[in-house]
From Swiss-Prot:
CDD domains: biotinyl_domain. This protein is a component of the acetyl coenzyme A carboxylase complex; first, biotin carboxylase catalyzes the carboxylation of the carrier protein and then the transcarboxylase transfers the carboxyl group to form malonyl-CoA. It comes from Porphyra purpurea. GO terms for molecular function: acetyl-CoA carboxylase activity. This is Biotin carboxyl carrier protein of acetyl-CoA carboxylase. It is found in: Plastid, Chloroplast. The keyword Secreted does not apply. It holds the Pfam family Biotin_lipoyl. The modification N6-biotinyllysine is found at residue 122. InterPro entries: AcCoA_biotinCC (IPR001249), Biotin_BS (IPR001882), Biotin_Carboxyl_Carrier/Decarb (IPR050709), Biotin_lipoyl (IPR000089), Single_hybrid_motif (IPR011053). The keyword Lipid metabolism applies. Transmembrane segments: none annotated. Keywords: Biotin, Chloroplast, Fatty acid biosynthesis, Fatty acid metabolism, Lipid biosynthesis, Lipid metabolism, Plastid.
Length: 157
């Protein structure tokens, strides 16, 4: 008996619907191993770098109007980057109440420098800058609830 694409599609569909975490299928020279990621949160998380968070990208067609051309006398454009939250949680600007805040407007940040903490499920996750630059705006207040992907700070690069 040959395994067809249809058989594989049916199998993958069943695995998605059921509570199957691991599946190993071996037939002659064909071998398939499926491992679903666990939905459990690791208990020993201390620091989470936002560079390790991946977002799914949906393909869409977007019509973007052409940019207006700038005159020669206009100011050169400034580059900005945004530090975003890699998770849902509570934003804190200092390691503990009453302690010195990590960064404030006007501070120069370096790559991998801790800029804030996001508390998620009673775990304090240090959020680090992925770029160097000057903090020009902090977009959330201490104690605010933030969503995954929400902008936290604006950095001039």
């Amino acid at each position: 008996m040959q395994i067809t694409i249809k058989d594989l599609q049916d199998l993958l569909s069943s695995v998605q619907r059921k509570k199957i975490q691991t599946l190993k299928l071996k037939k002659n020279k064909f071998e398939l191993i499926l491992n679903k990621p666990s939905k459990k949160v690791p208990q020993e998380v201390v620091s989470l770098k936002s560079s390790h968070i991946f977002k799914s990208i949906h393909s869409e067609t977007i019509n973007i109007p052409p940019k207006k051309t700038e005159s020669i006398n206009s100011k050169p454009s400034t580059n900005y980057a945004t530090i975003v939250s890699p998770m849902v949680g509570t934003f804190y600007h200092s390691p503990a109440p009453g302690e010195k805040i990590f960064v404030q407007v006007g501070d120069i940040v370096k790559c991998n420098q801790t800029v804030c903490i996001i508390e998620a499920m009673k775990l304090m996750n240090e959020i680090e800058a992925e770029i160097e630059g000057i903090i020009i705006e902090i977009l959330v207040k201490n104690g605010d609830i933030v969503d995954c992907g929400q902008a936290l700070m604006k950095v001039e690069t």
